Amino acid sequence: RGLRSIQWLRGLREDVGRKAPLYFSDWRDGLTRKSLAAISFLFFACFAPVIAFGGAMGALTGGAMGVSEVLVSCGLSGMAYAALAGQPMTFVGPTGLTLAFTAALYQWCTFMSLPFLPMYAWVGCWTSLMLVVASMANASGLIRYCTRFTEDVFNALLAFNFLSEALRSLATEFVDASRGFLAFDTALITAWLCQTTAAFRNKRYLSAGAREAVSDFGPAAVIVGVTAVSLLPAVQRLGDFARLSMPSTFGLSGGRELFVNMLALPAHFRWFAAFPAVFLAVLFFLDQNITVRTVNSPSNNLKKGAAYHLDLATLGLLTGGASVVGLPWMCSATVQSLNHVRAMSLGSDGTEVVETRVTGFGVHAAILASALILPSFSAVPLPVISGVFLYLGQKVMKGNQFLQRCKTVWLDEDRLNIDCQDERQMVVLGRGAVARFTAIQALCLAALWALKLNPATALIFPSV
């Protein structure tokens, strides 16, 4: 009775019917100078995380995937998503939890002496099927049961994963004390410069346009600047840096063929791949819908409406396509998507937004084109990548009410500021109620982190 009661394809039909009449205007409305300006700085805002994730991906998968694959996957997936999805203001890209799942899958394949890429392809294809079926069954409607409680724990987990990967990479540099401290200082300087430049729009220096330019171009400029400084002879005399491992010419890692030989995986493991795929599908379902819901928030003043089911179906198809050619999976990226909405806002109050497919398509086309200068990325020190991860972790923490309550619960009751929402909760609800609620969230986060640390459960950790 449960399956028969599902109105199959209803949500997809409604999304397509609502979005099809607007499709031409989605492209036409973006043919402006504002879109060109937005593409130029959104490229740099998206490019820095792509390079960071590419470097981490290479280290965590034994070189099976690297910067080349992340660039190509992000570029192609982003262009396809901009052209096909219902909400073009959402950007797709590499995410921390997807990286964690991929790393856990690689470790499990190594432990079981299984070929990684064939297993990866089967898991991705099963996930693709599950996401498409979920979109056909109108499952995105379930996201209304996802509350701020879940979102805060989810974002805290994402932030901690960024910080963990950064510190893990830096720890490997401490085989020599001087090299380790040089790497640690470089990462801290990179993180501080990224944070400072990204927040420059809130300063009082220079003109509004100049502040916006510094803020938007800042993180990518920091990577270039710190890399250039690391190549100076005076700095190199202080110690050597581990740098990104890049091929001399563009190509897939290890010189492999484009399509993964999926038949190289034993037959019974092809069916077993559906088990981890369930957890990856849950992760993508939550990440995708939470991000798109954030983009469609009434505070962003979007007028053309949401299309959750069509967005999920598009992501499912992209996941399947990336899997069969062994490219990293992409998912909706919250920070980049919100930057896109802000970049296309009109006026200082942002009461109107140009909703277009041009910018998303253009940004990811530029990311794909950057693969032509791939060898130059081999100069980037790995501590710079760690610094970008530290910055991203700090950025995800910002505005997280759970993490803010972890601090305010210790404040002196006589010194609480009722004008601050988190501190006002302490006054209205009482310290005990706030502390118990925060403790439950902390226990959930700790349980998830314990799953990550246990090799036997690392595969299911990102989606639990």
Spans of model-derived segments:
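Transmembrane helical cores of multi-pass ion-transport proteins
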Residues: R1-V464
